[in-house]
């Protein structure tokens, strides 16, 4: 049991964002619409899927030094997992913001008291995180396009009962597609290919033994992370006041990131209200039309 906890703690240091359960039900006095994402394809770890994942890595787009670091993890990989393919209706602008400002997502979790996890940006494409339970890690984005992100992660787990920290490295390949609205019910479809290596042979052995359990947890948490993006997109559409209050209370997030957050929220809200009004026959909505549902009773 202790080995299981240690191994899971090490993995959580790499991907702490995936361990948080998001289950908001009300943002203010208005009931939130149901938050839902669709699992389009289950997670998999087969050799065939792994070979496809390896072939899909954008290694030719990396500088020599970065490519070597990635290939070291791949060569010594202990575990592979393709997380579920998930479809969601979230606004792409919201998804785009959080994938480029992960510390803002952590800031929201802290305000909502979901977690006290800390994530700080240390360079333009690098972050360090601390879960506060002995787990800590770093994330570096090596390659980024509108539809792909390749990340190199390092993490460790420290405990008074262990003679030395247990460490791990991972390569994560986030793949995102934006389906044609005429052909899909989803605005976003994404998945992650995950390659993990443990320097310790003992930890690797334990990790392989508990892989069915850890795979299930990783799949579940990726779905819940997707639900968080869906939740925030829904909140921006329907509860702009609540979103503004959350942004004002966030810590560990730069002023310009907060301003961008609010701009994204305002853009999403206005577009949503205009669409709603157009469906009700109002083609040229005024500012008063847009904010009417959020004003108090006239005196």
Question: Which positions does each model-derived feature cover?
Answer:
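Bacterial N-terminal signal peptides
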Residues: 9-21
């Amino acid at each position: 049991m202790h080995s299981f906890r240690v191994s899971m703690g090490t993995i959580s240091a790499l991907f702490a964002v995936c361990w948080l359960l998001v289950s908001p039900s009300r943002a203010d006095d208005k009931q939130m619409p149901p938050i839902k994402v669709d699992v389009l394809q289950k997670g998999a770890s087969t050799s065939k899927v792994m070979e496809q994942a390896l072939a899909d890595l954008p290694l030719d787009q990396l500088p020599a030094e970065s490519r070597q670091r990635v290939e070291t993890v791949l060569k010594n990989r202990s575990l592979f997992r393709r997380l579920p393919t998930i479809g969601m209706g979230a606004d792409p602008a919201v998804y785009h913001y959080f994938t480029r400002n992960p510390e803002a997502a952590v800031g929201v979790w802290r305000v909502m008291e979901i977690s006290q996890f800390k994530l700080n940006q240390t360079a333009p494409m690098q972050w360090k995180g601390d879960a506060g339970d002995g787990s800590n890690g770093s994330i570096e984005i090596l390659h980024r396009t509108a539809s792909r992100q390749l990340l190199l992660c390092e993490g460790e787990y420290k405990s008074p009962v262990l003679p030395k920290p247990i460490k791990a490295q991972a390569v994560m390949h986030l793949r995102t597609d934006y389906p044609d609205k005429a052909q899909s019910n989803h605005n976003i479809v994404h998945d992650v290919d995950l390659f993990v290596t443990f320097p310790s042979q003992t930890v690797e052995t334990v990790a392989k033994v508990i892989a069915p359990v850890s795979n299930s947890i990783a799949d579940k948490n990726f779905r819940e992370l997707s639900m968080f993006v869906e939740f925030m997109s829904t909140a921006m559409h329907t509860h702009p006041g609540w979103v503004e209050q959350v942004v004002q209370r966030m810590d560990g997030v730069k002023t310009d990131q907060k301003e961008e957050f609010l701009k994204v929220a305002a853009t999403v809200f206005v577009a949503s209200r205009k669409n709603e009004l157009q469906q009700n026959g109002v083609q040229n909505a005024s500012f008063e039309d847009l904010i009417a549902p959020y004003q108090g009773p006239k005196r």
